[in-house]
Amino acid sequence: MQINGKEIFKKGTLMCRLSRMASLEYQDKYIVYPTINKYEDPSKMAELLYTECRNALLEQFEFCFLPYERDALRVLVELIDKNFNDRSLLEADDYEYLVHHNPSWIEVRELALKTLYTFGYDLEDFDYD
């Protein structure tokens, strides 16, 4: 989709990825206590969020976001870069520890929630089933 010949950024996927990273309930259900058919790989989850945020920050989409939204995304990208530069941190055997006790994961989750708020959404706006 375009406006005046410029491609617009589709924010739906970004909001979905933010909400999943921001939700402890989602992470408990799909990372800590997954089923064989419904599970989430934390490494892939972080990577998909990171990629979606980076894409949103591309210059061609600058007009799609308010300055404070871009700032929030930039801060989140920097934190993901800092905390998950070593991807082995996300490939733990104990996902309960990762989700509930790993300071790096918790910090990213909390910032993802703040970023979601920046866009005017709350976790109750999303259905994970």
What are the functions of these language-model segments?
Residues 1-56:
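Short terminal alpha-helical segments
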Residues 4, 11-14, 80-81, 103, ...:
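A general, composition-driven signal for non-globular sequence regions
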Residues 26-33, 66-69, 128-129:
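Hydrophobic transmembrane alpha-helix bundles
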Residues 39, 94-97, 126:
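Short, surface-exposed, charged/polar-biased interaction segments
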Residues 44, 59, 119-123:
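Generic structural motif recognizing short loop/turn segments at the entrances and edges of beta-strands
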Residues 56-114:
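Amphipathic protein-protein interaction modules
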Residues 88, 92, 117-128:
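Structured alpha-helical bundle/scaffold domains in large eukaryotic membrane-trafficking regulators
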